[in-house]
Amino acid sequence: GSWSTSRELAFYPNVKFEGIAFRYNAKTGKVVLSAHYEDQSGYVAAKIYLAQITPKGELEVGTMERPLGYDSRDQSLFIDDDGTAYLLSATNMNRDINIYKLDPSWTKPVLLVNTICKGLHRETPAIIKKDGEYYFFSSKASGWYPSQTMYTSAADLGGEWTPMREIGNNSTFDAQFNRISTVGKTCGVWSYHWGAQRKYKTPAGNFPRISIAAFNKGYASMDYYRYLEFSDKYGIIPVQNGKNLTLNVPVTAAVPGARGIKADCITDGACTESSTYFQKSSNAATGSP
């Protein structure tokens, strides 16, 4: 057998698995499977499923229960620089987020390290570490509809975390936050537009939307670009089509009700809609508005 050989690992006819993910544990040489476990009918089991596998070996289930007795729904794994793995889990009926330390095999929770985001109803938990600082990202529980991505940061997983901060726009560019990953020298935020699941379906259906994230001393930002390129050397490269024709072009307020209001900001290139407060004196591509 090899890593590309298809075979059935296990069969659970009466179980639903959500948020399935795979991580390679270099210390054991095995791949760890993590998932949210629910019974086929209902949504009250709220268990975590952790197992490990090799190409020729049998599936070894480490955990198929509530972690340390706590209910668990949306979940993910975070691997620290020293190879220690942590389970991030939405708990207390999605009100809080628990952080558990896992054993060396990454298949069994052994310690509740912290409970964060208490009472905030955050989902799809994810942590990334940059320059010694931990950043926790999540979406708000909102069904299939967009929600505001928020983050918090800390110097220690078990220590005090900052208050939640907003990042991106208030709809995460018409999507829900899902994960954050390092690509080359850059970081990408993956969010999903669940258009096929909405009451009024969107033409494009379901698709991922990727934003570029930046970090600095506990603060984070992310920007949306319609087009991206991926480079083995540079990571994610934003592609901005078009040209800003009004850069450094003087502008004046032409609407009577806007007299005395500074108009400089209207040429910053950030607004793509017509303004009811400022009018161009000419529709020419260049020249003074």
Identify the role of each PLM range.
Residues 1-19, 23-122, 129-134, 138-171, ...:
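Beta-rich carbohydrate-recognition and catalytic domains
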Residues 21, 178-180:
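Signature of short aromatic-glycine-proline-rich micro-motifs recurring in repeat-based ectodomains
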Residues 25, 49, 181, 211, ...:
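Small/flexible residues
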Residues 186-187, 271:
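Short, solvent-exposed loop/turn motifs
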Residues 235-289:
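Disordered, acidic Ser/Thr/Pro-rich linker "stalks" and the adjacent N-terminal cap
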